[in-house]
């Protein structure tokens, strides 16, 4: 749901996604092995500040049951009084397929936001279990790990179970996130999650 997989769309595919309605993404597959994505939100508040992320995912290894992809990106905020603010982001993902079509799989992914002494790593494992042509179960375990001395307070772990309706040109994910290992019970025990993707194939 949140973590990427090793899959890249066929060359010439244009795709659009929305996460919880607010977060929007557009992307294009420049080849069978590489795709570019632009992710952001509408302007927030009176100042019109909004987050923006431009990423490139490239498939570097593709066996029948193993996919490995690398990710490079710039991410930041646009519309600040001091000027736009961007940081680099790098990551990778390995996907292990349980069948030839890779309808069911497990993946391990990690990405690092490069902020010097405040560098953060977002890592996790995910599972997709295809039940039928129209249904799949999803499960993720995600962690936020500080690598720098100035980001020690930013850490956490969460579990995200979900359900996917997978079709050829669109898919819908429904699920929720629950924080684990917290000292105090959060006001909202779970956070609902919805993601919708539509793609135009060449």
PLM regions with names:
Residues 1-115, 119-122, 128-202:
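Transmembrane beta-barrel domains of Gram-negative outer membranes and organellar outer membranes
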């Amino acid at each position: 749901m949140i973590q990427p997989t090793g899959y890249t769309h066929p060359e010439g595919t244009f795709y659009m996604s929305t996460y919880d309605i607010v977060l929007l993404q557009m992307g294009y597959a420049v080849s069978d092995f590489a795709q570019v994505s632009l992710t952001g939100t509408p302007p927030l508040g009176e100042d019109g500040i909004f987050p923006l992320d431009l990423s490139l995912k490239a498939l570097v290894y593709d066996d029948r049951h193993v996919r490995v992809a690398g990710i490079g990106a710039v991410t930041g905020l646009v519309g600040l009084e001091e000027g736009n603010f961007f940081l680099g982001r790098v990551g990778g993902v390995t996907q292990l397929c349980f069948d030839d079509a890779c309808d069911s799989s497990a993946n391990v992914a990690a990405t690092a936001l490069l902020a010097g002494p405040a560098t953060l790593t977002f890592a996790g494992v995910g599972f997709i279990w295809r039940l039928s042509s129209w249904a799949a179960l999803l499960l993720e375990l995600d962690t936020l790990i500080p690598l720098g001395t100035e980001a020690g307070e930013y850490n956490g772990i969460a579990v995200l179970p979900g359900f996917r309706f997978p079709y050829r040109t669109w898919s819908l994910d429904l699920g929720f996130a629950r924080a684990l290992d917290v000292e105090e019970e959060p006001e909202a025990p779970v956070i609902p999650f919805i993601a919708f993707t539509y793609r135009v194939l060449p």
